[in-house]
Each structure stands twice: as C-alpha cells, then as structure tokens.
Amino acid sequence: MAKILVLYYSMYGHIETLAGAIAEGARKVSGVDVTIKRVPETMPAEAFAKAGGKTNQQAPVATPHELADYDGIIFGTPTRFGNMSGQMRTFLDQTGGLWASGALYGKVASVFASTGTGGGQEHTITSTWTTLAHHGFIIVPIGYGAKELFDVSQTRGGTPYGATTIAGGDGSRQPSAEELAIARFQGEHVAKITAKLKG
C-alpha cells in the first residue's frame, strides 16, 4: 500500500482547509493510505495568539525523520514574500540527514499554497520545488487537469503548479468551492501517480 503524507503549515486555517481537501482527493484512490500532519510552530505562543493564529488545529505535529516513511508527500505552505513560510523552511532545513542518506530520493512530492492577495503563489510553489529537487523527489504538478483552472469568471487561486487559495489582505476570504475542487484534484492526481510508482 502506498503511503501519502499531507504535510502543511497553516497560521490562519486556509492551508489547513486545503490540506483536508487534498487528503480527501487522495483517499479516492484505492491502495493508498493518507495521513495529515503539520510542521511545528516556531513563533512564540504569545506572538502567535496576538497575531490571531489558529490554535485548535487537529493534525498531529510531524518530525523531519518520519518523512522517509512515506512514498509521497504533498507539502502545503502559506506564502511569505514569495517563498514558503519560515516554519516550513525551518522544518525542511532539518532534513539534511535524510538528504545525506538519500532517504527521500525517488519519492513523489507536490506543493500547494495560499497568499493574501495572490502575489507570489506560483513562485512559492516553484521555489519550494528547489528544496525538493535537492532531495531527488519526483515533483508532480497538476497541469490543467482540473477544469476549474479554466474558470476566469471569479477571483480564485489555483495554478498548473499546484492548488492555491487567495485569503485576502485581512485573511477573511476562505477557500472557495473551486479552490477546494482543485485541491481534491491535486490529492487524487498525486495519489494515483504514487500508487503506480509504488507498484
């Protein structure tokens, strides 16, 4: 059975919501076991609470060494100035031992993201790919396989690189039905490829 990890960081819950949709899509594929985990928070608790961070996230916290236990990993991160969040960066910076041993080489990876106003969402995904390439992950974008990517009638996230959501400058906009559909597509797409490669 192929094992897939949906690994995310979410401060306000947008990426957490997308992670749930990604996992839902992946679970449509038979022969796949899906786990959702999050990376540790690095902000001091007081600063996190003052910033309005979501403290009741149910996903357990992952440790870097356990990444080797999975056949495919779908990473989710909010955009911070066109890059992944510091929390995800800190987590991935602890995977040097996995890199040295080649523990992640040949595993499947994909990325999803959120932005406040849309700026940097594609760059966040593609810049995250750089770290994944150094590990030797097989990087899986979604292309234009999700029909929702052709809908230009409304503001929405979603790119050929991976699912995204636009949270709005104040974070009040939640993922739309179209954005969640794209996320489910990504989960299912990555799960199918992972299962095929696992054999």
Curated annotation (Swiss-Prot):
Q: What is its EC number?
A: 1.6.5.2
Catalytic activity reads:
a quinone + NADH + H(+) = a quinol + NAD(+); a quinone + NADPH + H(+) = a quinol + NADP(+)
Taxonomy, superkingdom: Bacteria
Cellular component annotations (GO), alphabetically ordered: membrane
Q: What class of enzyme is it?
A: oxidoreductase
Question: Per the annotation, how and in what number is the cofactor bound?
Answer: Binds 1 FMN per monomer.
Annotated binding of FMN, by residue: 10-15, 79-81, 114-119, 134
The name of this protein is NAD(P)H dehydrogenase (quinone)
The organism encoding this protein is Yersinia pseudotuberculosis serotype I (strain IP32953)
The taxonomy runs: Bacteria, Pseudomonadati, Pseudomonadota, Gammaproteobacteria, Enterobacterales
